[in-house]
Amino acid sequence: METRCSLLFLSLILLYLPKPGSGFGSSGPIAASFGGSAFFCAIDASGRQDVICWGKNYSSPSSPSSSSSSSSIASSTSASYNIPSMAVLSGGDGFLCGILSNTSQAFCFSSLGSSSGMDLVPLAYRTTAYSQIAAGNSHVCAVRGAYYSDHDSGTIDCWEITRATNNNSLIAKENPNFYDQIVSNLVFNNIVSGDGFSCGGIRDGGMLCFGPNSSNLGFNTTSDNFQVLAAGKNSVCAILNLSREVKCWGEDESFVNSPMNDSRFVSLTAGPRHFCGIREDNHEVECWGNSNFSLIPKGSGFKAIASSDFIVCGIREEDLVLDCWMVNGSSTLAYDPPLELCSPGMCRAGPCNEKEFAFNASILNEPDLTSLCVRKELMVCSPCGSDCSHGFFLSSSCTANSDRICTPCSLCQNSSCSDICKLHNSNFPDKHWHQLQRLVLIIGSCASALLIIIIGCCVVPRIVTSPNKEDGAANQFKSCIGKPDLDTDQPLENVSPAPSVTPFAQVFRLSELKDATNGFKEFNELGRGSYGFVYKAVLADGRQVAVKRANAATIIHTNTREFETELEILCNIRHCNIVNLLGYSTEMGERLLVYEYMPHGTLHDHLHSGFSPLSWSLRIKIAMQTAKGLEYLHNEAEPRIIHGDVKSSNVLLDSEWVARVADFGLVTSSNEKNLDIKRDVYDFGVVLLEILTGRKRYDRDCDPPEIVEWTVPVIREGKAAAIVDTYIALPRNVEPLLKLADVAELCVREDPNQQPTMSELANWLEHVARDALIF
């Protein structure tokens, strides 16, 4: 009994542990190993619970669906095995453990780039299901029971993971130092592990710490209840259940300068000589211990964090992207985390507890992603925030399905937020001075308007009486055909000009666009694609616009500099036959692009989806205008732009029935430019064939289903009239339609050298459009 007691340090503290922290020796959606072979892993947000790993000397076993994780790992060694999907992760010295998402079995692996680093569970425990797992410095303890079960308590198993003396590889074996008759008979709710000790919450109440080094922790009997535990190598910190304050035991240097009593936390992580926690109010990270914490991100909230020896990584709450920083004073990371979306928490059976919300996967704007968990009945419960970081104010409180919303102080427009943002002294120093400023602005504006009217009265008559002089805007848009008239006998020159083009892009506030789209609600949605969602919006001044909102995947896979470069180019290009960018917003990490609204939908809708049919005169004008838009992108835009996805659904019709080319992007590889330009020509030829025949590009109900395969042989035989759309009455003069067929056939030739340029096509189709006026 004395030997047993020497191995066992028992503290019956009235302790409640509903979920562990994400620290060393505990478990969470992100974890880190220690030592010279340190590496990190996190559970991704794909809905498959795949594991992403990165580290300086880590040979990625490449998760089945994550191809980019290895790109951020310094080691170039490739491994031939996969890490299975996990429900939870926990890190030790040079290895990580987890619970498999499908079987609840334990799985441990190291940083070694071979299968020998993947068998770190003794045979006796490999088929056992576990509900909790905690990797210590060189041992692992786990609570028996199915992870997703409503009953998450059970007896524990412990085993040792040590280094072989001959080749420094890791091996797993049972460890009698952690076995005790008292421990084996107890039922645990949770478990955490450190260097030579483990601590767990007992189902009947209290906490038990056991192992060779457990007596060094120096626990004192207390009646406090605790919510979260994190174990360092020689210390433990816990979050009080009611006050959310932190208490620590063990090695003093690990928790020197620990948080003040008024600091409240929801999560903890531990390194060898430090602890870090996520604050309850604004979800920012605060650290303490014997390290340098000057590099902690300020103004950023986190969902989960994990620490190795000198690096802390976390999952940002605003976009679920990984962020890492040093805690030893060095500003240079030895490796960067991968650009992947990570799970904000662990999947579990609901409902969520008080002061928690169920994370909604739809906010990631990922098509077909409805849950972050492999089992759809499970959910990720995240702690609610109650306050915001400096520079933001609380605009919406936490609900059952969403966290609180923080809005930049730059958007503060009333007294409810001015106190928080401290705007009284800086923005509203004196009411009378503010009124005087408004008066000066009003008088100045009126005087300017009067001056403009006087100048206009003098200058405009001279312009009107000088028909031979054209201004720059007229020259720029003189080739545009405006609103089509149903009277086809009207001369082409008398067709009304296209609407004016917005001369510059506007910077919008996020709040403006949220209001304009009714909070980006589904009933405002116009469409969706790989970039994100497109919403119909009505601005405060009554203008109708289309707002394209990038999804999270687009944001993290697009370099910020690349986006800024593309945005600068899009802001500067203007033409009456493209959908022009009106403005943008990048507040709160969003990427919102505001475009002209096209009320008559797409060409595809009118040709194939039962919308109002288009007359032959209008179809040919649309063909010509589309060619003009592509010609501008190819030859006049700076730098020139290759569309890359020319199709009838990317030809939009504005309020005047003018064709506008939409959804064009940039090409960065100069080696592919010529090929891509010819691809634009080919795809434009397919659009011409759709206009001519009324058939889709691919129609499985037709034989042959490919429109090019069906039409080209007929056109080359001189029988183009046989493929003309029969749902529209043939005009008296079919010659323009036959010319249109010939132009389309040139575009879809297999040899790019035989294809015309967009300038040639625009010129030819302009002549065809003139001939079409005598239908």
From Swiss-Prot:
TNFR-Cys repeats: 351-406
Family: Belongs to the protein kinase superfamily. Ser/Thr protein kinase family.
Membrane topology per record: Single-pass type I membrane protein
Locations listed in the record: Membrane
PANTHER family: SERINE/THREONINE-PROTEIN KINASE-LIKE PROTEIN ACR4 (PTHR47460), SERINE_THREONINE-PROTEIN KINASE-LIKE PROTEIN ACR4 (PTHR47460:SF1)
Signal peptide span: 1-23
Active site as annotated: 645 (proton acceptor)
Sugar-bearing residue positions: 57, 102, 167, 213, 220, 241, 261, 292, 328, 360, 414
Binding of ATP, residues: 526-534, 548
Major site of localization recorded for this protein: membrane
UniProt function note: Serine/threonine-protein kinase with low activity.
The name this protein goes by in its record: Serine/threonine-protein kinase-like protein CCR1
Organism: Arabidopsis thaliana (Mouse-ear cress)
